[in-house]
Amino acid sequence: DAMMYKIEGEDLYLIGTSEHSMIGKFKDQILKKEQLPITMTSYSPCFRKEVGAHGIEERGIYRVHQFEKQEMIVLCEPEDSEAWYEKMWQYTVELFRSLDIPVRQLECCTGDLADLKYKSCDIEAWSPRQQKYFEVGSCSNLTDAQARRLGIRVKSDKGNYYLHTLNNTVLASTRALIALIEN
């Protein structure tokens, strides 16, 4: 709750990511194997409360309370999630490279992973002004953890099983703008 904007007097919040809304559409559903993979994208406003003080390099449009974000979501067979993970983060890298922006992909160590995440990486763009890379997106494989929490399963002759979910930030407007202007 410390990172989210709650609407007073309501049990409503402004979203920090569209991932929850998109995957939530499938809550408590049993899908057919033929429906997979389900690939979705969303362009939405995102709202974040930032906690704590940040350094001078995070002033301006780097860390803002409202921004636009393009996201990719995949619901897939468990055996396909690793391939989707690789494909998804590469889409973001290819987008930035097509704009002649130097980027790199960094795998997050397990100690830095948020709840439910099995694997995650950050996509970072080069900042000539700061002479260092900064985060412009991230990609995560939650394996079946999110599907278990939401009750999203796949129908099978051998019994129903949980699918895998993945998400990827393709473009966060303000950080992409910084990378574009500086490069």
Regions found by a protein language model. Give the residues of each.
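TRNA-recognition modules of translation machinery and tRNA-sensing kinases, especially anticodon-binding
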Residues: D1-N183
